[in-house]
């Protein structure tokens, strides 16, 4: 039974050159008429949605997509007649993306109304939903829609979508600019344990045990001279969601440097670690609502100079 399930999933997925699923193709919903169209799944995001409506339903739909940070105009699916055109814009440059679509079609197989939901807002219902059959696409936690397909003739008959994983986001780097830069990247499933070495003036180092495909991967950064304490996260039942701390200019060893002076950690279950180091200077908090920390980056030399994190949806 497990083998059959995997086969069925992959049969509706876009596969990369290494055999990994890049996007899942969701079956088109609506009527059976019209000619099939497919915008594909090779986009980074959706920038704008244009819908042309009339007395008999939605005449056409058009999407502007995002590729390599630039908006790319898409094709019209359907025809343009007398009616109204409405546009729904996604703030893709600031992390907004479509998570689901609700639609309504009538007995003749013509799409009558559509509603788009992003991770930040919901569009108005575009069209006339009353007394029509409703369907939904997407709405999977941690996933986003990055492409559409469907069928259209003299009107829009059906619509489907491509569902892909929401890409990680990178926080700002906080602290000083001394030491060497390092970056663990965002390609981990979660964090299992954090080790912090500190002295009475600053943080010296941080070690992280990551989870990756069922294995523990350890990353070490900084000088391990000092007192070391650890904070464990019960992954996958618990996630690291926040790093709080301070940074300050201290004398180390014979000149002043801007370094991280304290750190503490918070999990999705509300557990908070002790504060490691000494609280002094400027306070910072690295967190993003609805996201877990899946990677760290920073700078370190003799002391721990700066820290940043990667977020991924829980």
From Swiss-Prot:
Entry GO MF terms: carbohydrate binding
Residues of the signal peptide: 1-23
Keywords: Lectin, Repeat, Signal
Family matches, as InterPro entries: Jacalin-like_lectin_dom, Jacalin-like_lectin_dom_plant, Jacalin-like_lectin_dom_sf
Gene3D superfamilies in the record: Jacalin-like lectin domain
PANTHER family, per the entry: JACALIN-RELATED LECTIN 10-RELATED, JACALIN-RELATED LECTIN 3
Protein name per Swiss-Prot or TrEMBL: Jacalin-related lectin 9
């Amino acid at each position: 039974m497990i083998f059959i399930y995997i086969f069925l999933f992959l049969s509706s997925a876009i596969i990369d050159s290494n055999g990994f699923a890049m996007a899942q193709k969701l079956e088109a919903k609506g009527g059976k008429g019209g000619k099939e169209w497919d915008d594909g799944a090779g986009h980074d995001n959706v920038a704008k949605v244009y819908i042309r409506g009339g007395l008999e339903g939605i005449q056409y739909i058009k999407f502007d997509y995002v590729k390599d940070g630039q908006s790319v105009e898409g094709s019209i699916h359907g025809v343009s007649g007398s009616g109204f055109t409405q546009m729904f814009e996604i703030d893709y440059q600031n992390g907004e993306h479509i998570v689901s679509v609700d639609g309504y079609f009538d007995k003749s197989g013509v799409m009558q109304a559509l509603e788009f939901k992003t991770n930040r807002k919901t569009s108005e219902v575009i069209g006339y939903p009353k007394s029509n059959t409703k369907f939904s696409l997407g709405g999977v936690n941690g996933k986003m829609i990055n492409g559409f397909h469907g069928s259209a003739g003299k009107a829009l008959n059906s619509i489907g979508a491509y569902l892909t994983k929401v890409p990680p986001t990178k926080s700002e780097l906080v602290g000083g600019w001394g030491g060497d830069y390092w970056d663990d990247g965002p390609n981990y499933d979660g964090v299992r344990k954090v080790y912090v070495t500190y002295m009475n003036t600053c943080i010296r180092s941080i070690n992280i045990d990551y989870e990756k495909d069922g294995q523990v991967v350890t990353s070490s950064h900084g000088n391990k001279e000092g007192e070391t304490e650890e904070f464990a996260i019960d992954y996958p039942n618990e996630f690291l969601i926040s790093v709080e701390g301070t940074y300050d200019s201290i004398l180390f060893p014979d000149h002043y440097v801007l370094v991280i002076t304290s750190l503490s950690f918070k999990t999705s279950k509300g557990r908070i670690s002790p504060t490691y180091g000494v609280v002094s200077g400027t306070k910072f908090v690295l967190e993003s609502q609805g996201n877990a920390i899946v990677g760290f980056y920073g700078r370190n030399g003799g002391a721990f100079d700066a820290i940043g994190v990667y977020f991924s949806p829980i």
